[in-house]
Amino acid sequence: MRLIAENLGGERGGEAVFSGVGFALDQGQALVVTGPNGSGKSTLLRIIAGLLPKAEGRLLLENGGDDFPSIASACHYLGHQNAMKTALSVVENLRFWRDFNGRGDSGVEEALDTVGLGGVGHLPFGYLSTGQRRRAAIAKLLVSHRPLWLLDEPTAGLDKASEARFAGLMAGHCAGGGMIVAATHLPLGIEGAELRMGVAG
């Protein structure tokens, strides 16, 4: 499987944010997108996820097979918002995302244990602290089983121990043949190529 971007351009509010972006990402690889605020990091991820239209260029997924015929079917996007219902329990939220992504055999409790939230699955999501909410959102990645993780500032709200745990999860995902595109202004603790946005020329 290979994700390819050629001469991509993005807009926000009708104004060009970036242009000429290109990269190729193979299974087992990560791409870390850096740059100042307003340089288009989030816009790029949303374009890859299919949440925003691209202004120009080409974006395609090669060799996804029958399981992943498109980028949308292959990716799970973790944005600034955790995309969890505050009134539902943590387990109910994760079951929704597991079923929505067609992976009904995934272990929700196991995912919670992996992110250090074992024992809180029965609580309403709204009861959790900021860091716990982010870890619960990270657990969505584990129950969705999508090969392409699109991560926008994924460690926001995490303490150092949780950051280290997540770095291990990302490394494990890539070691298993997964791919990651992560936008960040903080070190993520993973090996990968860097794409710096907002650089003249």
Swiss-Prot record:
Gene Ontology biological process terms, A to Z: cytochrome complex assembly
Q: Where in the cell is it found?
A: Cell inner membrane
Q: Does the keyword Translocase apply?
A: yes
List the cysteine pairs that form cystine: none
Name the domain of life. Answer: Bacteria
Reactions catalysed: heme b(in) + ATP + H2O = heme b(out) + ADP + phosphate + H(+)
Q: What is its EC number?
A: 7.6.2.5
- Report the function annotation for this chain: Part of the ABC transporter complex CcmAB involved in the biogenesis of c-type cytochromes; once thought to export heme, this seems not to be the case, but its exact role is uncertain. Responsible for energy coupling to the transport system.
**Subunit comment for this entry?**
The complex is composed of two ATP-binding proteins (CcmA) and two transmembrane proteins (CcmB).
Protein name per Swiss-Prot or TrEMBL = Cytochrome c biogenesis ATP-binding export protein CcmA
Species per Swiss-Prot/TrEMBL record: Mesorhizobium japonicum (strain LMG 29417 / CECT 9101 / MAFF 303099) (Mesorhizobium loti (strain MAFF 303099))
Biological classification of the source: Bacteria, Pseudomonadati, Pseudomonadota, Alphaproteobacteria, Hyphomicrobiales
| Gene, per the UniProt record | ccmA
